[in-house]
Amino acid sequence: MSGNLLAKWIIGKAEKSEAYRAGTLTGMKHPKPDREMIKAAGGLPELIRQADELEKSGYIRTEKSNLGADMKKIYYSIDVIPKLCEKEGIEDPRKQQLRYIKQIEQLRAEVQGSFLEGYYDEIIRRLELGEIVKSPDMEDVDFFRCLNAVVNLKKSLWMRVFSAAVLNDSKRFKKDYEKKGDGMERSASV
């Protein structure tokens, strides 16, 4: 495995935090090494080695005992997480959330005044709260292209003609997206 596994563990903790993704988490964190952290780093000696590496780079501070053979606590500022993400080549969870919000705002602008505007408003609300939106899949750009294309239809089209026009594949809409729209109908009525 490449990279610093302790750094990835710290990033993973931030990724699970709605407050971090919403941009409201600040201050310092000071976790005690537990089984989960030790296992994630590849064992206690590896955890200590990786912590030393991050400490020398100025990302964290550690509190050790037993002449450096054991670790009591790790201290790090929330502000260091974007730097750790950059170091490890991982998209910062907060930046990802902001990217999703911008993406949905652009999609909402394309369908302003339609029934989809409320659906997009709800997704934006959830993203601003720091929620991980899994449905719809935020990375599935084609799904959103289909939604907006439906709103902009001037006349009825056969499903395959629509699929070919929007997705360049006459069977893809039926195969991948026909059922996904069901959940959207319930959200749009909220």
Where do the model's predicted regions map?
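Nucleic-acid enzyme cleavage-core boundary/entry regions
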Residues: M1-V190
